[in-house]
C-alpha cells in the first residue's frame, strides 16, 4: 500500500552531506546495531541506491567533500529550534507548529484494534479514547505557551475514508501468497493463529494499521506541515485472554525516534526511499535531542523506569536509556521530527485504575493510596520537556 517513490526528491540533496556524516547516521541510527549490509552502497564520492524501477534502475546522490560547503539548497518544510524567530519576550513556544497525533482510533473501533481493556463488566479503558483526551488537554497547555497546535485526529472516527471491507481482495492475496489459498472469511469463534489466518482479521489490520496511518501521513505532510509531531500512545504488556485479562506487575516508559531498519525492510523500495529521505534531510539531528529532552522530563514527572528492548527491531538512540530508534510506519511517513511516546502500562493494576479516572487535578484515593492523574503526569512531562528544549535551543 506504499507509494511509488519519487527518487528525484533524493537527488535534490546532492552535495548536502559528506560521506562521513552519512556513514555516521547510517551506522548509529538507521541501521540495526549488528545488521547485515544494506541494499545500497556508498563510496567516497557518492551514494548509489537501487530504485526497483525499470525506467531508472539507480539513484545516485553525490556527497560533498569534507571541507566544502553544502551545494544543496534543499530545505525541509519543518524548522529546527535554532531556525525559529527570536522570542523577544513572547511566550516560549511562540511560532512553533506542533501536530499532536493521538494513537489508534478508539470508540467503537477499540475492540477491533485490540486496544480495549476491561477487568470488570461495565468498565473499560480504550487507548484511542485516552490518547485523544490527552491530546486535547495537551493542546490547551501548549497554546498557552504560544505554540500553534494541530490535531491529526480530532474525534473517535478514522482519518482514512477506507473501511475493512475495502481490503478483502488484498487480504485474500496476502493469505494466498503465504500458502493459505482457501482462508476463512470470518474469525467468529476462532482464537490464536486461526484468527489471524482469516480474511476478516487481515482486512481489519490493513484498515487500522496501514490505511489509517497513511491517511494521517497525508494530513501531516500535505495539510498541517508542522515543525514536529508528537505521537501519543499508552503502552501495554501481554494480558492473556481478552475475555479474562491479567494485570501485569510491570510499568515503564520509553520514547521512540525513527531508525533501526532491517535489511529485509529496506528491500521494499518505498521503505528504502522514506528512510533515505529522513536521513538526507537530517531530521535525526533535531529529532534525537528533542526526544531525549522530552524523555528526561517524562521520567522525572512519571517516575517510571525505562523499558528495555530485548528484540533486534530497536536500538538505543544516544545515551539516554529511555530513547530508542525503531522503524514504525508513523515515525517514518511523517516528514519532520517525530517524538513517539509510550508511557505507562495500561494493564498495570494501579495505572489501569488511574486511567479509568480519566483526567483530574491534584490527587485522589485509589487502592488506598493518594495518586495523581496519569494523563496529567503525561501532559506535564511533555510540556516541561518542550519548554526546556526550545528555551535552550531557539534564539531568545
Region annotations inferred by a language model:
Residues 213-226, 244-248, 328-333, 338:
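Mature extracellular/periplasmic domains of secretome proteins
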Residues 2-103, 109, 164, 173:
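Non-catalytic propeptide/linker segments at domain boundaries
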Residues 15, 91, 124-135, 206-214, ...:
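Solvent-exposed, acidic/flexible segments
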Residues 238-239, 256-263, 268-285, 289-291, ...:
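Active-site-adjacent mobile loop/cap segments within catalytic or ligand-binding domains
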Residues 84-219, 238, 248-252, 259, ...:
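Active-site histidine-acidic residue metal-binding/catalytic motifs
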Residues 145-156, 207, 229-233, 302-316, ...:
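Surface-exposed patches in mature extracellular/periplasmic domains of secreted proteins
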Residues 97-101, 149-153, 227-232, 254-257, ...:
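Structural recognition of the beta-strand scaffold that forms the well-ordered cores
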